Amino acid sequence: AKKAIDSGDFFSYPPVPGYLDFREAISEKFKNENKLNYSNDEIIVSNGVKHSITNVMYSILNKGDEVIVFAPFWVSYSAIITLADGIPVYVNTQIENDFKPTKEQLNNAITDKTKAIIFSSPCNPTGTVFTKKDLEEYKEVLENHQDIIIISDEIYEHINFTNEHCSFGSLENMQNRTITMNGFSKAFAMTGWRLGYIGAPLQIAKSIKKMQGQTTSANCSIAQRAGLVALMAGNECALEMKAEYLKRRDIVYDKLNEIEGIKVNLPQGAFYFFPEISSFFGCKDSNGIQINSANDLSLYLLKDAKVSLVPGEDFGAPNCIRLSYAASEIELIEACKRLKESLGKLTSNGG
């Protein structure tokens, strides 16, 4: 990036879909890592995956079109669908099933208004990884509905503890109806660079290009040069980060299982736990204030334990809270200790 700045060659507007050499590198990444064969013209560089999702929804949705969303989901999915005049249709899942919907649930959610389905793997907020077997089951359902577009958010691809990431578009006869999204925030810790990309069937990619051309235009030229270097450098840093996250996950999992009243599963990717905490609803703190929701519990823990958690309501799971383990081992151990102490103070009778 510094070299690009010093050269003075990248101060003009880049092409709307991104520099050709960058899109070529993304195409090679898709081919080598994901078994996807998107041409350069089927790739659009964006200002991050949220921008990609926005481009996609505004490009494919007409007013009243439905988009199936696996819940829990990343909070922006439902908001962006609604902004684009679409209707989110939620498929609710349970922690006992690792937050994976059954193919029967998927089939029951489909109507004649269904335009697309969106999910992330690994998933934020649950850490769920959809295996090839899982995706094959969903494919069985979707083969009976050829007009439905699949939107696969793979931003956490390299924080996958199963070591078997599967892109939905790599399944037989699925690439021609799958939009694959990825970026640099997680694998390369480049959150501030705002750099994402889409691989999409050509006609959809053309529509996305038009949409982006009339809104943000191209992504920052210098960010693209940094992204190109990151792709060329390979995944060694991502593998190192994944190993660290795996150690932290195991530490937090053991600590959370020591806390009475919390129901927790073992996430297979990303860097979040999403425990079920509804057993604390109806309990009271030492001031007699009753806990009635995940939001109430999160506020209580912020005040009493000085631990920041995200309530599950906006993720489509009102009985859960999200805990990130993107912190040091010392901080995580201390946080779990505080959570245990503060939750232990809650009583059902206010005593």
Q: Language-model features: where?
A:
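Conserved PLP-anchoring active-site segment centered on the Schiff-base-forming lysine
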Residues: 59-81
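PLP-dependent enzyme catalytic core of the Aspartate aminotransferase-like
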Residues: 107-108, 284-292, 296-351
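Conserved glycine-rich beta-strand-loop-beta hairpin in the small C-terminal domain of fold type I
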Residues: 228, 243-256, 264-283, 319
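N-terminal small-domain helix-loop-helix segment of the aminotransferase-like
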Residues: 1-48, 55, 231-233, 345-351
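Active-site phosphate-binding strand-loop segment of PLP-dependent enzymes
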Residues: 93-163
